[in-house]
């Protein structure tokens, strides 16, 4: 098992065991299933108190992308480039946010314990889709795709999930 596999396994195990919410394990399973199918490129932007990312849809990768935002205080959202909230939220973090957390761990932009705390802080907060912030995330992403700014994606490979 590689160091990356070990970090991801530690994060996923700790997330399942420390967040007392029955909706989280099935969402983790969906995220891992998605990552096991094929390579994925995730654009991750993490600061001391905010995680923002862009993730392509698994079912419609050429048509649909999601912007996510998770703050250390527990505020979060996920929505499409058409500025519609993610249908998988249902009041809790969705698989897209979990995917972004895993990519953050893999890229060493956040620690396991830090990301667990951030997720734990979401327990009493409902998602609130923030269109201006989502738009800003998508504009930054498009600027990176167009080569206007440098924002390198994190590549997640199916091999990263051999331990699952």
Question: Where are the model-predicted features located?
Answer:
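Long, low-complexity, compositionally biased intrinsically disordered regions
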Residues: 1-164
């Amino acid at each position: 098992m590689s160091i990356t596999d070990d970090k991801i396994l530690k994060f996923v195990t700790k997330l399942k065991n420390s967040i007392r919410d029955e909706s989280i394990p099935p969402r983790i399973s969906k995220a891992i299933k998605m990552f096991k199918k094929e390579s994925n490129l995730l654009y991750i932007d993490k600061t001391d108190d905010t995680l923002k990312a862009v993730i392509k849809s698994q079912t419609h990768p050429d048509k649909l992308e999601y912007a996510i935002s998770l703050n250390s205080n527990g505020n979060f959202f996920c929505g499409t480039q058409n500025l519609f909230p993610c249908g998988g939220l249902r009041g809790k973090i969705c698989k897209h946010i979990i995917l972004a957390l895993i990519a953050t761990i893999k890229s060493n932009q956040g620690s396991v314990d830090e990301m667990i705390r951030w997720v734990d802080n979401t327990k009493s907060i409902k998602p609130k889709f923030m269109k201006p912030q989502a738009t800003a995330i998508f504009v930054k992403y498009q600027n990176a795709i167009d080569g206007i700014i440098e924002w390198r994606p994190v590549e997640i490979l199916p091999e990263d999930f051999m331990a699952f």
